Amino acid sequence: MAKKSGVALGGTCLLGVGLYSVSESAAVIRHRVQKETTNRRLLRWAHSRTELAKFKPIIGPPLLVEGEYLFTFAQLMELMTVAALRAKGVTVKAIRRAHERGREKYGNHPFAREGYRTDGIGIFTEEGSEEAEELSRQQLFFEEVIHPILADVSYVDSLAAQFSPLGNERSVILDPRVAFGSPVDKETGVPTATLFAMSNSGESDEAVADWYGVSVTSVRDAIEYETALRKAA
């Protein structure tokens, strides 16, 4: 078996970065962006393993924790954008070059930067380049598909800090500063998995809401999202 490669943690503090397994990341992306996204594809976009050596990664490598690959929240946001672009036929080569130019302009995780949302695809390209021509053809797609996704992302210091997978008007959020980025109720921080489990035990939505101090709407949003994640898994 090939040796796993990634960024080993050592004494690195994980507070506030969010942590998602490859399968969890794929489920989030399949639910919101591209149903065909696979675990292997995410790893291919993130880094090159021995058996995938012919593929040059797009984003930085995942963390390696006790033999398991974990993506940070910023990486999850980047992977979501990559998946959306690939779903519309933008080549990996064009996305990779756009990411490289974005990193030069914005620093690490350019696809998770607020500038990407405001400036669009063109900010990462050089006039006349191969990828500029290709990505310009996708500008309408960017406005119709990518913008709605990024509109549900909140930023702190220009970096993605919170994502509302059901939309900003709904109560479910992914926030790396809360519960390591697991989906939670926006107002209380109660994990959606907890609300879902209690509902599945036979309790009414009203009883669950009263027990955890959340609204009935929050309980129903949690059930909807957790059900969707399980279908996407």
Whereabouts are the PLM-identified features?
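Short, Lys/Arg-enriched anionic-surface-contact patches
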Residues: 1-12, 169-190
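Short alpha-helical segment immediately N-terminal to, or the first helix within
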Residues: 14-15, 85, 197-198
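Polyanion-binding surface elements
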Residues: 11-42
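Charged mid-protein connector segments
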Residues: 90-153
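Basic, low-complexity segments
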Residues: 51-53, 142-180
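Long, charge-rich, low-complexity alpha-helical segments
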Residues: 188-233
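A short, Lys/Arg-enriched interface patch at domain edges and termini
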Residues: 68-99
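Major-groove DNA-recognition helix of helix-turn-helix-type DNA-binding domains
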Residues: 35-63
